[in-house]
């Protein structure tokens, strides 16, 4: 997606959202897609409210911080009819065992996206993962 023109990126993103509407395994589909995005070496301060970027501006990027990927997960789900009424949160979390910062997307308090580039249920998340800040995503439509 990085080498595409902006208009083509919008089409790819729209096609993903359309496929999420009917796919029997939507969380596998979205995590596979997100795992193909290039991760930037840039750092963003996810604790700063101004670090949240609107969806269309995210698409302008050629690479993404881990926080931007979490935002893209959230926006993608919110802009589908299937998940538009779901509660979407970004959890800025820390694996206290590995001293690693994580940006996880929680859907309806039960599904976690982005942990090890997979979808998992909240009860299967290791107990060493501790949320440090929760960003509740406002509905988009």
What are these regions (language model features)?
Residues 1-141:
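A structural boundary/capping signal
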């Amino acid at each position: 997606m990085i080498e595409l023109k902006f208009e083509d990126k919008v089409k790819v993103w729209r096609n993903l959202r359309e496929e999420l509407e009917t796919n029997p395994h939507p969380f596998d589909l979205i995590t596979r897609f997100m795992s193909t995005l290039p991760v930037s070496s840039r750092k963003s301060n996810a604790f700063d409210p101004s670090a949240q970027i609107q969806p269309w501006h995210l698409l302008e990027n050629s690479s993404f911080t881990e926080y931007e990927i979490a935002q893209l997960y959230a926006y993608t789900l919110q802009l589908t009819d299937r998940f538009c009424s779901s509660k979407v949160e970004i959890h800025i979390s820390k694996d206290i065992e590995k001293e690693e910062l994580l940006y996880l997307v929680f859907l309806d308090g039960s599904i976690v996206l982005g942990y090890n580039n997979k979808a998992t249920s909240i009860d299967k998340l290791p107990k060493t993962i501790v949320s440090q800040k929760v960003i509740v995503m406002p509905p988009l439509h």
